[in-house]
């Protein structure tokens, strides 16, 4: 009976539907900070090359051109992408089957299946949003006993790129302008490009409005006693940042529900992240090939083509004892940082 009810639902349709599910618009980390990329394998690989090119030397006319030296250093890291996913059993199945036997069609069952397919996709993307936040926070992606899996990927981010504010920004007498200027100097010293934007919480951004250094900069005060004490408006804070050529601030306050009923923030509320431009050269969220996708690309009538194998895969099936219909979402994926020293993740309070 189950086979007859589900015979019109193909693996091809389910996967196409799953991959058409839109990512949450607020998921900036996997959306544009470390964007998603599909790779044809199960291993991530990063390659960093640094080349030192010395200045040329003048020579006398008719003298031999000197032979220059060069210094090239290449660091290559690879590892296995970890699997993730989940399985749903269709709820209230007995009620649905009884309704079908009374002459109704299987549309309710089909609708529930596709609802679960969408939920699998969103769940996997939510976990990867948390993973990117984990990597950005301390330079490491860490799993500790998650379904028996323990993994640590260390991107080797220098400690200078993970500073702490000289004085917590919750103190109105702190100097966030001086802090950010120092962090920009750290980036310049390593040859990093100017950050495109700052990613932080509303709470951290709001601290600038009541900060003495920002007020003094806005009003052009030399003596603190002459500085108005009014809280700055957002556009006034932006004016100060523009004056010092500081990158624009983007608010990121995403919270993701966990299966224990709590909410998790991908990024701690106290982090101030300076994000570089050209981010596909900095880091990505890599999706590889799952065992399920390999199975779907084989046989006389494959459900998907080989080039479609990387990414999120959702499969479905049924059994008679006990009577169950299930869907399963799968992926092998994690964030990978290619260049560890062109961003700043600062703790500001």
Q: PLM features: residue spans?
A:
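Ordered core of a single globular domain
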Residues: 180-238
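Long, contiguous amphipathic alpha-helices that act as assembly "spine/axial" helices in icosahedral shell
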Residues: 82-158, 175, 179-180, 185-206, ...
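Short acidic (Asp/Glu) and glycine-rich catalytic loops that position anionic groups and cofactors
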Residues: 160-162, 306
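A surface/extracellular/periplasmic glyco- and lipid-processing/surface-interacting theme
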Residues: 163, 167-178
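Assembly/oligomerization interface modules of large self-assembling protein complexes
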Residues: 31-100
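Sequence/fold signature of self-assembling virion shell proteins
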Residues: 215-349
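N-terminal alpha-helical "arm" segments
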Residues: 1-42, 336-349
